[in-house]
Amino acid sequence: MNGDHMVLGSSVTDKKAIILVTILLLLRLVAIAGNGFITAALGVEWVLRRMLLPCDKLLVSLGASHFCLQSVVMGKTIYVFLYPMAFPYNPVLQFLAFQWDFLNAATLWFSTWLSVFYCVKIATFTHPVFFWLKHKLSGWLPWMVFSYVGLSSFTTILFFIGNHRMYQNYLKNHLQPWNVTGNSIRSYCEKFYLFPLKMITWTMPTAVFFICMILLITSLGRHMKKALLTTSGFREPSVQAHIKALLALLSFAMLFISYFLSLVFSAAGIFPPLDFKFWVWESVIYLCAAVHPIILLFSNCRLRAVLKSRRSSRCGTP
């Protein structure tokens, strides 16, 4: 998911790496198709009915940001695979990085706001603050979106400034892409400017996300225990509903965790871009990204209704 791994220094010719890159592209296509369906299904309903539940608005926004992000990363992967010796901060990669930085921040913040919304609306804590937030949160949705746009734009500009300065320094000193001096200058800027900025940008929404997810999973876990004590077993509808909700939340949390770790590992250089372990890690990340939209399709009632209507129309039933 990370765009920073596109800094390559030699041709990717290893057969295993080529196979994994092919798998990555296929997984990205699955993720693009899944997020595209979610965006189209909820987006059409939003346009036609002029109204949509706040959680579904956040969901369609998250699906759209995921769709665009996957498309940008896929284009970047193809470009770097075709031009492995390209300078990491050339104009083409700067343009792609600009889009990636904005969409990446958007994905993190939309995921965070969705977790906040689920936590406040679903969790059954008796603290007065939760009751107050339940009544106020829906009205704050526009401000939540505006805040994401402002924060994402601000951090994207800061990233662009750093990337552009490194490219200007490269042109000024007539450095080769893999010159030792050029690498040291780029490494210094990445270590003391880009990396701290990335960690601040990514950690803020991640911290909020984890707090909300822990509260929400704790609340649902308590409810499921109570339901098990008052029912005959796991086949009861109330227990099944809690299990489905927990599975959806856990998949959401696992995707977010894998996403955040991929960002940190790539920024820290733990997995070198040409190392086989890097491509294995990327395959695992994109497997999560491909599976998550499928889980959403079957856990969201509106999306399930769209799927049923599509099936019935294909079968010729009303």
Swiss-Prot record:
Q: Which residues form a coiled coil?
A: none
Compartments, as annotated in UniProt: Membrane
Membrane topology summary: Multi-pass membrane protein
Q: Where are the glycosylation sites?
A: 179
The UniProt entry, under InterPro entries, shows:
TAS2R
**Any one Pfam family match given in the protein's UniProt record, by short name:** TAS2R
Please provide the record's keywords in A-Z order. G-protein coupled receptor, Glycoprotein, Membrane, Receptor, Sensory transduction, Taste, Transducer, Transmembrane, Transmembrane helix
Q: Which residues lie on this side of the membrane: Extracellular?
A: 1-7, 62-88, 150-183, 256-264
Q: Which Gene3D superfamilies match?
A: Rhodopsin 7-helix transmembrane proteins (1.20.1070.10)
Transmembrane intervals? 8-28, 41-61, 89-109, 129-149, 184-204, 235-255, 265-285
Instruction: Sum up the protein's function in the record's words.
Output: Receptor that may play a role in the perception of bitterness and is gustducin-linked. May play a role in sensing the chemical composition of the gastrointestinal content. The activity of this receptor may stimulate alpha gustducin, mediate PLC-beta-2 activation and lead to the gating of TRPM5.
Family per similarity comment: Belongs to the G-protein coupled receptor T2R family.
| Name of the protein described by the UniProt record | Taste receptor type 2 member 60
**Which organism is this entry from?**
Pan troglodytes (Chimpanzee)
The organism's taxonomy opens as: Eukaryota, Metazoa, Chordata, Craniata, Vertebrata
